[in-house]
Structure formats: structure tokens, C-alpha cells
Amino acid sequence: MKSPLPWLKRRLSGRADSEHAQNLIRIIITTLFISYLGWRYQHTHGDTLMATWLILVGELLVSLGLMVAILLRPQVSHTRRLIGMLLDYTCTGAIMAIQGEPASPLYAVCMWVTIGNGLRYGSNYLRAATAMGSLCFLGAILISPYWKANPYLSWGLLLGLIAVPLYFDSLLRAMTRAVREARHANQAKSRFLANMSHEFRTPLNGLSGMTEVLATTRLDAEQKECLNTIQASARSLLSLVEEVLDISAIEAGKIRIDRRDFSLREMIGSVNLILQPQARGRRLEYGTQVADDVPDLLKGDTAHLRQVLLNLVGNAVKFTEHGHVLLRVTRVSGSAEDAVRLRFDVEDTGIGVPMDMRPRLFEAFEQADVGLSRRYEGTGLGTTIAKGLVEAMGGSIGFKENQPSGSVFWFELPMAIGEPLKSSTVRVPTGALVDAPEELESSNIIAFSNPFLRHRARVRSMRMLVADDHEANRMVLQRLLEKAGHKVLCVNGAEQVLDAMAEEDYDAVIVDLHMPGMNGLDMLKQLRVMQASGMRYTPVVVLSADVTPEAIRACEQAGARAFLAKPVVAAKLLDTLADLAVSTRQLATPATTVQVATSFEGVLDSSVLDELAALGMGEEFERQFVRQCLDDAQNCVGDIERDGTCSDWEQLRESAHALRGVASNLGLAQVASSGGELMRMADWQLQAEWRLRLSTLREQLKAGKDALDARVQGVKDGECSPRSNE
């Protein structure tokens, strides 16, 4: 039988106030006074003792009832608060009136209840408690012979019961005002930092985007070295901007915790891949130790845990010049069977932390001294971000000295034991058919290491509309999109977007969120109204330097198809466009499309492979491309069957997403559409229909394979290639 204590703790830990603590103390004090009076009158009997006992028992029973009510309805209840206050004062006043001198210590209880209500619930409750307590004590003075016989003491205590809480009320209001002003100042600082981070992203967008375009051109060794330096500097600046945004989110309490199953050792391995080269460059010994009793499969926020480790271990590498850096993971004793508490220790032999710095170690924008801030780059936010993330995940963090030199940063986190992870098939991306060396760039084989050429091979050309009020941002997007094979029209405002869409159809729109006049959100809302009136649906991608959770949520609610952060990352942009191409492909009916056979109409969109053939890659390449894509599609169908058998609906959606991407590469419209439907289905729908959907997918894939075989045979015979019409 499990103990009810963990359930009680979970039930009460998330409450918005501390009413349960006040009620628990009431129960304890009532019990203590029952014991006190029993000891005081152990040899005395009488009606007053019986009345006192009945009052105390009644208060105890009502208090227990209030505790049950709190457990059943943990929400804030003003009615329960008032009932508790009335219970305290009426019972205290009645006992003081009945018992007289032996009950005089209850005056302290009256004062405690009054001050406690003020501290817990605010000034209004403090004044109400003062009035209730004064009236109850006044009743005891007027009834009890003891208090009547000591008028100076009685009236003096009554004045104290009024004056002390009222004076305390003035102090409480001053403290509340000071806290509110400090909070407003902190919020203003956070807004300023977030705004500055937003402004940094705009020039970074031009810098990062243009260097990605430049990296795809022919460069000699010296130019490549210069370009790598520029890109590394841009990434470093972006990481500083991200740290400022992280600390702003932590201070605003907007950190979202996303708990998922993950492999602890794989996650630590990904951290090692990033930090080991840095440690090797500084000639440091770098190692990790995970205790044997630490489970590998856990459920927790792996992204934030990884960020904490990168901050702490990265700091250890940065501040260590000789010796070693060691990450240890151990299991804290006393962990439950279905949960575990892990301790992470990051040990180094670096410069350590000076004594005068330790109290401020986890404060924002702090480094050990000015000399260090010049010597070691950074904002001084790493430990602050780590502390905020660890506490948001329900853990604790600290520091201790590592003798004879260095430091040890540690943190503990509670985690649930994860479900066994299925071994997933490693899918080779369709684009990775050829790892072409430089000498093959001039041949008729696509260099698939180039993301733009890979995108052009996978995604048909689309008509894009781009809106941004900064000319540099428009130029970056235009260069990136044109290099990826798309046709682009750039405008500088949201009004021009609506005008352009009223005149012509576009496959997708990329719009900045914040622009003068009509902003991106207003444009999205207006566009949805126009589309509801009969205009063709066009997906909209929001590209913005404002990456706050509120901005992202507002864009989703307004109908944005995707949200991308500035500075634009070419790989993410191209992946998003590939996803959009699936939803818009069925609307495209180019006049140059050559149908393979009328029996395959609706099964195969020949324009996709026609565009690939138009790149001049050769017939052999197209056959290899089709063969690899079909193999990938068969693997995806097998994954869907495995996921359905295991009732892993989330992974089934991921497998359907992969199938949709592969099918869209081939122009298999039916398969891509069915994959998209599976992605959007709820768990209960998948549970009921996945076998039927899988059977349909297999039939559609077989029909698509027949259509592709016919096309490939036609290409071989010279019947279907666009070049045959030249």
C-alpha cells in the first residue's frame, strides 16, 4: 500500500496561496492547547473545563473539515478564509472569557492570527482580522471576571491588538509598494533587453543570410577562411543574443517545460560532440562518468537539460587552462522505483571562484572581476540561465570548491523513468545519393552537399511573395529563394502584400511580423477574411526577430503556417518551403506537364520529376533518384505498421511526416495526401483507422510505383523527357 503523503504534497504544492499552511498550523495549535489545558487541570473537574474541551474539539473538527475542503477544491476560496478567521477568533474569545487567567496566553494567538492573515492575504484581510480580533477580545473583557478585575491590563492589551496590526499594515503597504516598483523596474529592464536583442537580429539576418549564399559559390582557400571567420563571429553574436532572450524569459516566468522520453547517455554524447573539440584545442583532459545505477531511459525536458550542461561544462572548459574537465552523473539515494533524482557534477581544475564572488555567482551579468570579463568573452549569464532552468524543472543547483584548485558546479533534478525507446530505422535522406567531391562539380551529377541544389532537386519552383520593411532583409530572402529555384516578388509592407495577392496567385508568402503601418498579424487576419470570401488559400510564413512565446502564439492563432526566427537559417527556410510545396502542389497545373498515361492521372504529378529532368542531371541520375525514394517510401510504410502495432501514435505521425516528404519528392500526390491526413489525425482516430489507412497507403504506393516505372521506361525510350520536345 502506497503512502498518501506524496499525493498530499502534489495536491497542495501547486496552490496559489498558503491557506493550507495556515489551517495546518491551526490544527497543531488547537491540539497543543488541548494538551496544555489537560496538563493544567489534570486534577480539576468542572463545567468550565468541559465547555473549553467542547470548544477546542469543535474547532479541531471544523479545521479538519476545512483541510478536506482544501484538498477537494485547491482553488483560492475567500469563503474558506473568512470561515477560518471567524473560527479562530470566536473560539479564542470564548475560551478566554470562560477560563480567564489560565487562558491568557491565547492573547498571543489572537495577535498571531491577525498578523498571519495580513502577511498571507494582504492589507484588506489584515484590517478585517484586526476588527474581528478586537471584537472577540472585547467580548472576553466584558464577560470574564478575571479581565474585569484587571482593567488597565485588559484595555491596554485591546489597544495593542488594534495599534500593532494597523502599524504593521502601514509597513506592509510600503513593502508591497516597494516590491511592485522593483518588479516594474525589472520588467522594464527585461523589455529593454528583449528589444535590444530584437534589434540585433535585424542586421544579423543580413550578415548570416548573405554568408550562407556566399558559401555556395566558388571560393579559394583564403576566401573560405575569411568566410568561416565571419560565420563563426555571427554565430557567437547570435548566441549572446539568445542568452539575453533566455534570461528575459526566465525572469518573466515564461519557461515552458516539455517532458519527453529520452536516452540520457545519448544526450550527454551530443554535448560531448560540441565541447570535446574545444577541450582538445585547449589541451585539456575531458571526460564523462555515468554511474551504473543511473537509468538510461528517462522522461524529462531534454532540451533544457542539454542547455544547462552546455552552459556549465562550457564554462568549465572556458575557465580552465590546465588539467581536466569532468562531468559526473550519479543517482541520489532514496529514489522511488518509478522516478529518480539525479545529481550532475561538473568538475574542473580551472581558476575557481573568488570568495567575494560566490554570493553573487548565480546573479545575472556577473563574472569574477573586470579583468576576467575582458579576458573571457561572454555575457555572464550562463550560470544564471542554468539556475533558472534547473529550478523551473524542479531541481536545485549549487557550487563547491574543488581542492586544490578549480570548482565543482552541481545540480540535482527529479525525473521519471522513461518508456523503452524503439530502435528506429536510420533513413538516408533522398538528397544524399552522392557525396560529390569538388572535382565533380562541373559534371552532370548534383553535388548534394549544396543545400540549394538539393532543394531544387526535391521541390518544384514556386512563386513567392516576400514582405519586409528592411531592404537588406528583402535582398537576403530574394537571393536565398532564387538560389533555391523559386520566383520571388519583394514588397516593403503588408498593404502591398494584400494588393499583390488580389492581382495574382502565389504559392507562399513570407512576411515580417513588425512593419510600419499594418503589421504582419493584421495582414494575416485581413488575408483570412479575404480567403473566406473566395480568394485562393495561400500559406503564410512569418519571419521575425521577435521570438517571444507570445509572438509565436499570436501568429499561430492568426493562421500563420510556420514561424521562423531571424537571422534566417537557410536549411530551416528550405525545409519549411519543402513542406509548403506539398500543400500547394495539387494547385499547380503547368501547361508543359507531360502526362505519362491517362490511367495514372491523379497518382503521379509528373511536373515534379520534369523539373528535376530540366536541370540536366541525366537519365541515370533520375533512375537512381526514383529507386532511392521508393526504397525510403517502403521503409516509411514499414515504420507506420510497426508504430501502429505498438500503439505509438506520436511516432506514427512522425513516420507519416517522413512518408509525405519522400512522396512529395517523387510527385506521388495520393501518397503525400494520405500521409498528411495521418499526421493530422487524433490518437483515437488512429487507433480505430490505422490498419485501413495503411492498406490504402500500400495500394497508393503500388499504383505510384507502377506510374514511376512507366515514366522511367518512357525516359529510357526518349518519350517523356522535356528535352525531347526541344
Swiss-Prot record:
Keyword annotations for this protein, in alphabetical order, are: ATP-binding, Cell inner membrane, Cell membrane, Kinase, Membrane, Nucleotide-binding, Phosphoprotein, Transcription, Transcription regulation, Transferase, Transmembrane, Transmembrane helix, Two-component regulatory system, Virulence
Null mutant phenotype reads: Deletion of the gene results in overproduction of DSF.
GO molecular function per UniProt:
ATP binding; phosphorelay sensor kinase activity
Q: Which residues form the HPt domain?
A: 618-711
Does the keyword Glycosyltransferase feature in the UniProt annotation? no
Mod. after translation = Autophosphorylated. Activation may require a sequential transfer of a phosphate group from a His in the primary transmitter domain, to an Asp in the receiver domain and to a His in the secondary transmitter domain.
Top class in the EC scheme? transferase
Q: Where is the Histidine kinase domain?
A: 195-417
One GO term describing the cellular component = plasma membrane
For this protein, the parts annotated as crossing the membrane are 23-40, 52-72, 95-115, 128-148, 152-172
Q: Which Pfam families match?
A: HATPase_c (PF02518), HisKA (PF00512), Hpt (PF01627), Response_reg (PF00072)
Residues bearing PTM 4-aspartylphosphate: 512
- EC nos: 2.7.13.3
Activity regulation note: Binding of DSF to the sensor region causes allosteric change, which facilitates RpfC autophosphorylation.
* InterPro entries registered for this protein in UniProt: CheY-like_superfamily (IPR011006), HATPase_C_sf (IPR036890), His_kinase_dom (IPR005467), HisK_dim/P_dom (IPR003661), HisK_dim/P_sf (IPR036097), HPT_dom_sf (IPR036641), Sig_transdc_His_kin-like_C (IPR004358), Sig_transdc_His_kin_Hpt_dom (IPR008207)
Compartments in which it is found: Cell inner membrane
Please write the reaction equations for the catalytic activity of this protein. Answer: ATP + protein L-histidine = ADP + protein N-phospho-L-histidine
Task: Mark the residues carrying the PTM Phosphohistidine.
Answer: 198, 657
What the entry says about domains is: The N-terminal input region plays an essential role in DSF perception. DSF binds with high affinity to a 22-amino acid sensor region at the N-terminus. The response regulatory domain, but not the HPt domain, is required for repression of DSF biosynthesis.
Q: What is the protein's known function?
A: Hybrid sensor kinase that regulates diverse biological functions through two distinct molecular mechanisms. At low cell density, the extracellular concentration of the diffusible signaling factor (DSF) is below a threshold, and unphosphorylated RpfC is involved in the negative regulation of DSF synthesis, via direct interaction with the DSF synthase RpfF. Interaction prevents synthesis of DSF, which remains at a basal level. This activity does not involve the phosphorelay mechanism and is not dependent on RpfG.
Subunit and interaction comment: At low DSF concentrations, interacts with RpfF.
Q: What is this protein called?
A: Sensory/regulatory protein RpfC
What organism is the protein native to? Answer: Xanthomonas campestris pv. campestris (strain ATCC 33913 / DSM 3586 / NCPPB 528 / LMG 568 / P 25)
